[in-house]
From Swiss-Prot:
The gene is trpD. GO terms for cellular component: cytosol. Belongs to the anthranilate phosphoribosyltransferase family. This is Anthranilate phosphoribosyltransferase. It catalyses: N-(5-phospho-beta-D-ribosyl)anthranilate + diphosphate = 5-phospho-alpha-D-ribose 1-diphosphate + anthranilate. Binds 2 magnesium ions per monomer. Its EC number is 2.4.2.18. GO terms for molecular function: anthranilate phosphoribosyltransferase activity; magnesium ion binding. GO terms for biological process: L-tryptophan biosynthetic process. Keywords: Amino-acid biosynthesis, Aromatic amino acid biosynthesis, Glycosyltransferase, Magnesium, Metal-binding, Transferase, Tryptophan biosynthesis. It comes from the Bacteria. Pathway: Amino-acid biosynthesis; L-tryptophan biosynthesis; L-tryptophan from chorismate: step 2/5.
């Protein structure tokens, strides 16, 4: 371990195996707080490489509680958080709409990082049980097309890093790991990142981790597909990565200002999304969710983004997405 730490102090990068070794020690609580802080800051200053991020993700997945992985195609839709926009929970709403469109979504999430309401905060406000046992969550995925996996329930080793992360008060590799350590190990993922510089490195990390198809996005300051600006995308498909840009017009949608997507407390966000998913919501909110669902559906092989967005809007207006919310809450 000391050899790996010395390497970091010399600003050298680790290979995947070394990173996996380091992060295995971290989640087992084997590092002193000072060593952990030094390792995280050394990586941050030099810039984390895809092989290192992948090694860390593998260590955390190896340490995670097991989830009965389905053999059918399913996806995660998740953002790093930390984009500072305090928007409504677009990815959470998108998971329910995508499920209503026939996709299977196992969403991995946590409590809020930067906004006043993370995906877990919102689901709790809907009365959805966060700590559903793995077998029951899998059943929800089979039957409703959507389930939610609460990170602290599966990743108990994370707690060893928490005090140091809180003291450092700065982003570290842990801020990008959340979306990469879904215990269900989905083959498909739509991942939003808080900075455009992360789009390609995270796509490369997903390639190392063996994802079949995934899209990493950043849109105008948001860790989602944007309807107020251009979205930068790196799409991984069978080992090849293609970078491109999308605008609201790519989805046949009109643009809306970022202010139109502002969220509030978990209770306020719940009311906003309840109206939206019942087909009575704000057109800007519907457009934002439709754009994200459209790109997610592309990963399942539905290549026409405009058609996908229209299907998502139809599903939103029909109120069928909200039935998934109430059905999931009823399993509590």
């Amino acid at each position: 371990m000391q050899t790996i730490l010395e390497k970091l102090y010399r600003s050298e990068s680790m290979n995947q195996q070394e990173s996996q070794q380091l992060f295995s020690a971290i989640v087992r609580g084997e590092l002193e707080p000072s060593q952990l802080a030094a390792a995280l800051i050394s990586m941050k200053i030099r810039g984390e490489h895809p092989e290192e991020i992948a090694g860390a993700a593998k260590a955390l997945l190896a340490d995670a509680l097991p989830f009965p992985r389905p053999d059918y195609p399913f996806a995660d839709i998740v953002g790093t958080g930390g984009d500072g926009t305090n928007s409504i929970n677009i990815s959470t709403a998108s998971a329910f709409v995508a499920a209503a469109c026939g996709a299977k979504v196992a969403k991995h999430g946590n409590r809020s990082v930067s906004s006043r309401s993370g995906s877990s905060d919102l689901l709790a406000a809907f009365g959805i049980r966060l700590d559903l046992p793995a077998e029951e969550a899998r059943k929800a995925l089979d039957e409703l097309g959507v389930c939610f996996l609460f990170a602290p329930q599966y990743h108990t080793g994370f707690r060893h890093a928490m005090p140091v992360r809180q003291q450092l008060k700065t982003r570290t590799v842990f801020n990008v790991l959340g979306p990469l350590i879904n215990p269900a190990r989905p083959p498909l993922a739509l991942i939003g990142v808080y900075s455009p510089e992360l789009v390609l490195p995270i796509a490369e990390t997903l390639r190392v981790l063996g994802y079949q198809r995934a899209a990493v996005v950043h849109g105008g300051g948001m860790d989602e597909v944007a309807i107020h600006a251009t979205t930068h995308v790196a799409e991984l498909n069978n080992g090849e990565i293609e970078s491109y840009q999308l605008t609201p017009q790519s989805f046949g949608l009109q643009s809306y200002p970022l202010e139109a997507l502002l969220g509030g407390s978990p209770e306020e966000n719940r009311d906003i999304l309840a109206r939206l998913l019942q087909g009575k919501g704000d057109p800007a909110h519907a457009a934002a969710v439709a754009a994200n669902v459209a790109l997610l559906l592309k990963l399942f092989g539905h290549e026409d983004l405009r058609q996908n967005a229209q299907q998502a809007l139809d599903m939103i207006h029909s109120g069928q997405a909200y039935e998934r919310v109430t059905a999931l809450a009823a399993r509590g």
